[in-house]
């Protein structure tokens, strides 16, 4: 299974000791999945990534990647509250509305407080798994 973990960050993903919370969660998920699947952990959309037909794309807090890449499943991993104004300002609203996205929230609070206007295909809660 081909899985892309995409995180929009300025951090250097090669050095896990200098990563922030969201990046660490993605890095740990990458390490967990890489033994069983073909997994790529990236912060940029390269031409090489565009040429691949992904089975799953998991993007943290950034739905715009779903417009650029092909995937059978599109999962938006929401770590923060996504208000409609913020989605407009960050140019994510159309990506959310026009892609068949599954939303994964890190808490029941986020799931409950994310607008139903975002017509997510599926809504699930998976708590953060940091120790």
Report the location of each language-model feature:
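N-terminal pre-catalytic "stem/leader" segment of glycosyltransferase-like enzymes
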Residues: 1-53
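Short loop/helix-cap segments at secondary-structure boundaries that form the rim of catalytic
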Residues: 47-53, 64-71, 114-118
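A conserved, positively charged/aromatic
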Residues: 75-76, 87-101
């Amino acid at each position: 299974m081909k899985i892309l973990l995409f995180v929009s960050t300025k951090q250097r993903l090669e050095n896990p000791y200098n990563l922030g919370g969201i990046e660490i969660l993605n890095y740990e998920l990458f390490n967990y999945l890489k033994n069983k699947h073909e997994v790529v952990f990236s912060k940029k959309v390269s031409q090489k990534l565009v040429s691949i037909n992904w089975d799953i794309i998991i993007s943290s807090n950034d739905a715009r990647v779903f417009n650029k890449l092909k995937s059978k499943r599109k999962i938006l991993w929401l770590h923060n509250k996504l208000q409609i104004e913020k989605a407009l300002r960050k140019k994510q609203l159309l990506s959310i509305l026009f892609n068949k996205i599954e939303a994964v929230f890190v808490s029941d609070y986020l799931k409950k407080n994310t607008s139903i206007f975002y017509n997510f295909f599926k809504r699930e809660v998976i708590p953060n798994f940091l120790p």
